Amino acid sequence: MNILEEIAVRTRVRIAEEEAAKPLAQLRKEAEALWEKELAQGVNLPLKPLQEEAGESSAKNSAEAGGRPGRYRFYRALQKEGMSYICEVKKASPSKGLIAKEFPYVKIAKEYELAGAAAVSCLTEPYYFKGSDDYLREIAETISIPVLRKDFTVNSYMIYEAKLLGAAAILLICAILDDEQLVEYLKLADSLGLDALVEAHDAEEVERALK
């Protein structure tokens, strides 16, 4: 078992514990209600081609229509002219250990925004990267640029959770997901107004990501 697989296994245990405290049905209801509220307020609507390509008149029907995933805040932020940077807020990593003992995560995110970052990536994995859901929530509430939840998405629970934490996008890693999961999670993210950053490590995974 490599480190990525090890983290994925630990993440499944962690999310099972969270789901025991807050059932999936409840989390899903809250996340869908938040997206409905955003739609009603005209917040974070997808780029126009979404409806045209999906053949639907409503953004929330795009995933069910099987059309191209929506392009929301995170996608749009990276479409600006010139180089676009996704700047990371990370306290630790398995390879480097503790990176920052003092970790003013909100201050770091604000400095990234002031420096011209297109988006911020926030680690929420607590055991190997010393991340926290609270880091993401507070950063998303403070800065105006979109925030990617950088975690090891292993099930739908984490996608609903990301929505409620204020993330604009989720990370999907090809190496820990099969093709069916990739499609399912991309559609689910789209149905909640979330973009997805798909991580691929080799040519085969790139092909899978582009299907």
Name each model-derived stretch:
Residues 72, 81, 130-152, 183-198:
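Alpha-helix-loop-beta-strand connector modules within alpha/beta enzyme cores
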Residues 89-104, 146-154, 197-199:
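Active-site mouth loops of central-metabolism enzymes
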Residues 101-120, 142, 159-168, 182-185, ...:
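Alpha/beta enzyme core
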